[in-house]
Amino acid sequence: MKPKLHFTAPYHWINDPNGLIYYKGNYHIFYQHFPYDNKWGTMHWGHAITKDFVNFEHLPIALYPSKDFDRNGCFSGSAIEIDGQLYLYYTAIKYAKENPSNVHNQYSDDDLRASQALVVSSDGIHFDNVKNKKQIIPMIQEAYLGDYRHTRDPKVWKKQDGKYAMVIGSKVAYENDYCGKALFYESEDGIHFEYKNSYQEPTIGNMWECPDVFKINDQYLELSEIDDD
């Protein structure tokens, strides 16, 4: 049985909500979705709209693997409106080695390759996964900056100065373990991003996922899901 109040996918697997935004008269809910089974697999972005958070209209899948850089999944991200268009930012996943027993799961943790990507839609309903995808931040190469396998979940917002900021969750080696880290980027147009700064805290988890940033009074608050595995 499906719950009556809690949002669910129309079928099969659902996890992280992504890209929650009010756009052109509707609240849009995107979410991590594997449309072929009731277990985690190659991630797509499911999509629904609502006006009251009680009645939902399910729409066609918004994002699905279609490029070499995201051939093994479209992981979590965020949405923002820029000049009337809807920008979806997500983590593109590619496996260095395919799993011969199940192509929908990585062979090992070391085989993940993560980069950041973008799709733009003019109506928030139709997303051209073939022509309109861009890899905007390639896989990290510098180990001191972040983990090339686990740098993900871009959150983008517009700053007061008109520029666009992005925060991405990651981790770096620390002593005999890992330390969670947030990477900060900046852009003039929401497409071309430049690395600006980072923050890490060894006492709070060994991986930070799904980061977000809020301004409260004169201070900024960074929130993340903490992975201690």
Where are these regions (language model features)?
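Beta-rich carbohydrate-recognition and catalytic domains
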Residues: 1-153, 157-209, 215-229
